[in-house]
Design a protein with these regions (language model features):
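Extreme N-terminal tail/first-helix region
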Residues: 1-25
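Charged, gly/pro-rich active-site loop segments
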Residues: 2-3, 83-161
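Short Pro/Gly-enriched beta-strand edge/turn motifs at strand-loop
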Residues: 21-27, 118-122
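Short beta-strand segments
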Residues: 23-56, 71-75, 89
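Short acidic/polar capping segments at secondary-structure boundaries
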Residues: 33, 58, 78, 142-146
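Short acidic (Asp/Glu) patches
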Residues: 53-57, 70-77, 114-127
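Short, surface-exposed beta-strand-loop junctions and turns on beta-sheet-rich folds
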Residues: 58-61, 153-155
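Helix-adjacent hinge/juxtasegments
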Residues: 61-97
Length: 161
C-alpha cells in the first residue's frame, strides 16, 4: 500500500529527530557552470527546512549563482554495509541569510542551529553578539525528499514531494 505525503513526512521527521539530536553531518551538492561541488556541512532542521552556518567560499558563491541544491543526510553503515543503511536526499532551493538582510530569519536560524548551546559546550560561554553580523547562514527549503531504508532484506524508498 502506498503511503500518503503526511505519512512520508512523519517518517522523514522521525529519522531527522532520531539522528539529529545534536546536528547532522551532511553532504551539500551545489553546481555552477556545469562544475559540481560537494561540501560537508553540519546542519539542523526546523521541520523539513534545514539550516547551517556557512563560511565564505565556493558553496556560497555557487548558491548565489544557482540556488538549486541537494543535501544528503545519512547514517554511516559500518561493517554491516547495507544491512541497516538509512538516509535521505533533499532537493530544494537554498537562501543565504545574514543578520543585516533578514534579522528575523537570521534569529530563527540561530535558534534552530543552537549556536549558543554549541558555544557553551565548546567554549564555556554564550555565542558572542559581536560575531553575529559576520555570519552567513544557509536555509534550504525542500521541494523533494527521497528517504531510503535498508534492513538487509527488502529496501524501501519513500519520496516526499
Amino acid at each position: 500500500m502506498e503511503k500518503r505525503k503526511a505519512e512520508i513526512e512523519k517518517i522523514i521527521l522521525d529519522f531527522l529527530r532520531e539522528h539529529g539530536e545534536h546536528h547532522f553531518t551532511c553532504a551539500l551538492a551545489t553546481c555552477w557552470e556545469n562544475q559540481p561541488r560537494n561540501t560537508p556541512v553540519d546542519a539542523r532542521n526546523d521541520g523539513l527546512t534545514m539550516y547551517f552556518v556557512a563560511d565564505p567560499g565556493g558553496k556560497l558563491e555557487n548558491i548565489r549563482r544557482n540556488p538549486n541544491v541537494c543535501l544528503a543526510v545519512f547514517i554511516p553503515v559500518g561493517k554491516g554495509y547495507m544491512k541497516n543503511a538509512r538516509g535521505l536526499q533533499m532537493w530544494g532551493r537554498a537562501q543565504i541569510i545574514t543578520m543585516e538582510e533578514d534579522p528575523e530569519e537570521f534569529e530563527k536560524g540561530f535558534r534552530t542551529i543552537r549556536l549558543d548551546e554549541i558555544s557553551m559546550v565548546s567554549y564555556n560561554r554564550p555565542f558572542p553578539e559581536a560575531v553575529k553580523p559576520k555570519i552567513s547562514m544557509v536555509k534550504i527549503i525542500p521541494h523533494r525528499i527521497s528517504y531510503f531504508h535498508s534492513t538487509g532484506e527488502k529496501p524501501v524508498t519513500y519520496v516526499w514531494e
